[in-house]
UniProtKB/Swiss-Prot annotation:
The lineage of its organism: Bacteria, Pseudomonadati, Pseudomonadota, Betaproteobacteria, Burkholderiales. GO terms for molecular function: rRNA binding; structural constituent of ribosome. The keyword rRNA-binding applies. Protein S19 forms a complex with S13 that binds strongly to the 16S ribosomal RNA. The gene is rpsS. One of its GO terms (biological process) is ribosomal small subunit assembly. Keywords: Ribonucleoprotein, Ribosomal protein, RNA-binding, rRNA-binding. Belongs to the universal ribosomal protein uS19 family. It holds the Pfam family Ribosomal_S19. Transmembrane segments: none annotated. One of its GO terms (cellular component) is cytoplasm. InterPro entries: Ribosomal_uS19, Ribosomal_uS19_bac-type, Ribosomal_uS19_CS, Ribosomal_uS19_SF. It comes from Ralstonia nicotianae (strain ATCC BAA-1114 / GMI1000) (Ralstonia solanacearum). PROSITE patterns: RIBOSOMAL_S19. This is Small ribosomal subunit protein uS19. The keyword rRNA-binding applies.
Length: 91
């Protein structure tokens, strides 16, 4: 179930403050955040946000197509090593 339209998109207040400060300045350092649940707003376009994936901060460069999605969608938490090879096929 999606979020109600009258509530608006969710974004952590501390992240919004950092984004507004970065948009005004010319500093291109990534914004470090643990807030994977925050929705990407149009103000984020062109910024690099370092999203925590449980182990490290993954840099995510925000583009126009990402608006409306959550930050956590772009910082994967699980590494897929591949399925086990079929032993019969090796012979």
């Amino acid at each position: 179930m999606t979020r109600s339209a009258k509530k608006g998109p969710f974004i952590d207040a501390h992240l919004l403050k950092k984004v507004e400060a970065a948009a005004g300045g010319k500093d291109k350092k990534p914004i470090k955040t643990w807030s994977r649940r925050s929705t990407i707003l149009p103000d984020f376009i062109g910024l690099t946000i370092a999203v925590h994936n449980g182990r490290q901060h993954v840099p995510v460069y925000v583009t126009e197509n990402m608006v409306g999605h959550k930050l956590g969608e772009f910082a994967l938490t699980r590494t897929f090593k591949g399925h086990a090879a079929d032993k019969k096929a090796k012979r």
